[in-house]
Amino acid sequence: LGAFNSVVAELDVVCPTGDCDIWDRKAWIEAKGPDGNWIELIRYMTPYGRSCNHTIDLTDYLFMLEGNVEFRIFTDTWAGSWEYNLTLNYFAGEPEYKYGNAVSVYSGNYALGDYANLQPFEEVTFNFDDNIEKAQLNMLLSGHGWGNNNSNNAAEFYNITNQLYLNGDVINQNPWNDCNPNPDACVNSPQSTWYHDRAGWCPGMATDVEESDLTPYLTAGQTTATIDYGVLSGSGDSRYIANHQLVSYGGANFNLDARITDVISPSNKVEYSKEGILCGRPTIVIQNTGATTLTSLTIEY
């Protein structure tokens, strides 16, 4: 890692000829890591025939976004066309760790409601390298498929809580998004159904990445992580599209450090529209960027 401590992507999705697909389509952007493996950085759902722009923090993958980087993009469409412009904005500073690595844990389509395989996510065990000082599980999950022969409109419109098992510990995950207003402030066509809430996505939105911290297992002396993802069943053509990654770091540059990753209030972000009006103290999200666990923080505002 070089002289940058964060990277933020600006994604512009445009209709240069005005004939963009009028339906929401799945898309994703991947980068090739130093080991030659492709890692999904952004999961995107296109808006209904409109142009939109998005801001996405990719600092978790800073270690693989320096130098000459190869990207590829896929959009699951056969009608109309889209143009994607991806700009990476780097911010000067010393990174949290000298080294990093990302490995796919789950990647692909996982059917819900297959009675021959009610738990499609297999159990996976990873060995931690001795040099790893921080690890986390980054989870990209979106639900798709629905219809009359389907229970509870799974998985696109099915609001359920799944269980992630990390070394036996249970972590609840609820892949669900309120789509009205659009979390990314993307204005869809009024003749569409963009306003329906969905499982982990909305039309014209970059899918949120949920993170689960694995570092406590390292500090407790454990050398492996056993990951098992349990899902509640739907039926019919229902499926999750998943890309879960084990991201690890080593060579901490700071013993005690922190950074502000988001400002909830005051904010003009649509996703914080209910909290963004400041009536008292500001609300922020911080990240521990040092090797020592934070126990207190002094903030001057």
For every predicted segment, state its role.
Residues 116-121, 220-221, 275-277:
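Solvent-exposed, conformationally flexible loop/turn segments
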Residues 5, 25, 122, 133, ...:
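Residues that flank catalytic or metal-binding motifs in active/ligand-binding sites
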Residues 1-19, 84-151, 247-254:
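Solvent-exposed, flexible loop/coil segments flanking beta-strands in beta-rich domains
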Residues 25-27, 133-135, 160-162, 292-299:
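Short beta-strand/loop motifs in extracellular/secreted proteins, especially
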Residues 1, 14-94, 143, 154-251:
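Beta-strand-rich ligand-recognition modules
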Residues 240-241, 248-301:
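Extracellular/luminal regions of secreted and cell-surface proteins that mediate adhesion/ECM remodeling
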Residues 9-11, 69-75, 135-139, 221-230, ...:
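Extracellular beta-strand-rich recognition modules
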Residues 55-58, 121-124, 208-212, 264-269, ...:
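Short structured motifs
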